[in-house]
Every structure is written in C-alpha cells, then in structure tokens.
Amino acid sequence: MEYNPPNTRERIVARRQRMRRNSTEPVVPGWRWRLREGLRSGRIVSGIVFVISCFALFYVLFSSRFRVQTVEVVGAEFLSPERIVAAVPLRGLPIWLVDEEQAVAPLLTSPFVEEARLTLSLPDRARIVIVERQPAIYWRTGGVDYLVDRQGYVIEAAATPPAEDELVIVDSSNLPVEPGMRLDTDALTLARELAFVLPNQIGLHPAQIGWDFGLGVFVRTAQDQMIVFGRSERLERKLTILAYLLADGTPFTYLDLRPVNPFYQYRPDGSS
C-alpha cells in the first residue's frame, strides 16, 4: 500500500487565497437594510410624492372635470350670445391650456365689438365680457346712413332713419364706407363740437353738417349759406370770426374759415 504524504503547505496556501478573494468581494446589503436606509434618507418618500404628483398633474390636465363646460357672455346687445360663443369655441378645451387673449381675438375683428375680455374660473367656467360699439353719429354717403361710434368706427348701415335730434354728417364726396372702417376722427370731433356750440353759443342752427374730401367739415344754414371749417385747429378763432360776421349782419353765401385770413363771398343766386 502506497502512502501519499499530505500536501499541507499547498492546502494552507489555497485556503489563504480563498479567504483573500472573499475579503475583496463587495458586501451586498439585504433588502431590510436598503429599506431602512431609503426611509432614513427620504428617497423613498420623495419617490412616492413624485409619483403621486405625476398622477395628480395628469388628472388635472386631462380630466373632464377641468374642461370648459359653461360659457357666460356679458354685455352683448347687438350680437347674440350664441354667435359670440360660436366665434370663441371654448367648450371641451382643457381650462389650463386656454390662452385668454388669443381666444377672444376673433371677436375684435367684428365692427360691433370695441373690447372683449375672457376670464376663466375653476373648474370649468369661462366668462366673456363684451363692450360693444355704441352708435353716436350717423354718416350719410351715397344715400345710405351708417352708424358710427365715438371712436370713428363704422358699425353698420342704419336700419331706420335717424331721429330729428340725431347728428348726421353728410359726405358730399360720396366715398364708399363699410363696417369696421374708421373715419376721420378729427372731422367727427369737430362736427360734434359744432353741433353743440353753434346753436348754444352763437345762435346759428345748422341745416346740415357735412364733410368733403377737399374741404373738410362744413355747415349749411337755412339761408343756404355754406361755412367751411375744415379741421379743428384754431376753432376758437374761427368761431369768433363767424360770430362777428353774423352779429355785424355781413351778407355772405360762402365763408371759408380755413385760411389765416378767412374770406367770404356773397352771391344772391347761390353760386360760389
């Protein structure tokens, strides 16, 4: 029987190498330790809050509860609320994604609308406030009377003739006019001023207040006199000269107050 001496030295070396390898391998912590560490550092709580926030944000953005359902229109007189709602299609849109200024922009293209505002209220309400143009003057051209607001914007052709006390400016040039067009604001301001000042301060009651492309604003009297004011500059001086001529009894059929040195003509036959 053959005897194999034990290789003690080699076994010791092999054992030491195994121990050295085991000591260099990283220690993998268990799930309990990882859970305790996550709770202690707040990472788990932060993750839970983040997930809940994502779900809440998704719900708020896309839930039907936060989509516009009710649209209220305030201030509409000429325009029907139904037409306004149709022009601003808000129903069904997520309330968070509605641009208030852009939404009402189509309304501002209407000749009836001077101002439009949109306010949103959670969870599903929209309120449109309309400031409509109010007719202040009639502008007559080509035999048609148009309603004009104080800013000079043409609203529409008048459905009924103006009343006796309404201010009507007659365009002797017969220039074409359409809704939404803005007229000469200086001419409108001057015409309103003359309609008040002439009868109340000078005692002259105009038979007609008109406008001409070349002359500007003019007035015709019951005696078939034509008084040209042009524009509103130096209005006080023009009124003073007119008042003096009327008080003096100076006869004239045509008076031009536009030049620095106004002039007048008197032709009983009415020609100028």
Swiss-Prot record:
The keyword Metal-binding does not apply. GO terms for cellular component: cell division site; plasma membrane. GO terms for biological process: cell septum assembly; FtsZ-dependent cytokinesis. The chain crosses the membrane at residues 44-64. InterPro entries: Cell_div_FtsQ/DivIB_C, FtsQ, FtsQ_DivIB, POTRA, POTRA_FtsQ_type. It is a single-pass type II membrane protein. Keywords: Cell cycle, Cell division, Cell membrane, Membrane, Transmembrane, Transmembrane helix. It comes from the Bacteria. The keyword Thylakoid does not apply. It is found in: Cell membrane. Residues 1-43 are cytoplasmic. Residues 66-133 form the POTRA domain. Residues 65-272 are extracellular. Belongs to the FtsQ/DivIB family. FtsQ subfamily. Essential cell division protein. HAMAP family: FtsQ_subfam. This is Cell division protein FtsQ. The gene is ftsQ.
